[in-house]
Amino acid sequence: MNLGLQGKLAVVTGSTAGIGYAIAATLADEGARVVVNGRTQERVDAVLAKLRLRNRGAEFLGVAADLGTAAGVETLTSEISNADILVNNLGIFEIKAFLEITDTDWFRFFEVNVMSGVRLSRFYLPGMLSKGWGRIIFISSESAQNIPVEMVHYGMTKTAQISVARGIAQSVVGTGVTVNSVLAGPTASEGAASFVESMAKQQGVSAAEVEKQFFATARPTSLLKRFETPEEIAAVVAFVASTQAVAINGAPVRAEAGVVQSIL
């Protein structure tokens, strides 16, 4: 299938590792020009070198900016003035009991996970509308619907992303611009791998056993019974970003391996 992404300019936030990196690589494989983002120039440069070595025919740009701040968003938008595709992937998470989550924590999570995407969408949307084509995608999570008791503040931001995406989509009906969220399931990112390895050492068991225990106890409804790979999420994102996905709009696209049990 031709996804029609040849020459499209895609901005992927938080793309120096994990799902963001996989999305950047996959969109480039489909012919898109990709803007990579991370907080430090050193990290961005390293990932650019890695991506260019992986795909010598692709065009990559890089912007170092902390998009969890308004100033960081301004840094990115001053360098990249337009985009055909915006993937709001930047996000943070931490395990913390509700009674231990401070006001500062709540505001920090909202700024990084929600407001980064709000600010960037507000900036790039007018250009998409003027061209009559564009894609805005928020990388949400199954935690948006299955609020994790161990990180309620994270779940709140993932639900907010779905609401923002739906609201923007309803504001641009019939324009050729689609706005969606993709709900990822538990994914084998660097952070997840570190967590699994740490738990394995603490328990004196293998990483595979920790993963098995995780899906037996923490995510028993998973139909996949393993961590998804970043590349599996990226493949879904690439399709949602494509010219073929015009009928997908305002939707929370579920790519969470069946963790969410509801069918509606």
Positions of predicted regions on the chain:
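Active-site helix of classical SDR
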Residues: S121, T157, A165
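Short C-terminal tail/terminal secondary-structure segment
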Residues: N146, V237-A238, N249-L264
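Conserved glycine-rich cofactor-binding loop
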Residues: L9, T16-A17
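Substrate-binding pocket helix/loop in short-chain dehydrogenase/reductase
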Residues: A97-F98, D105-F110, I136, A218
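Residue(s) in the substrate-gating loop at a strand-loop-helix junction
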Residues: S141
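Alpha-helical segment proximal to the catalytic Tyr-Lys
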Residues: P126, Q170-S171, V246
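Short, small/polar-rich loop/turn modules that mediate ligand/substrate recognition or access, typified
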Residues: V173, T178, I248-G250
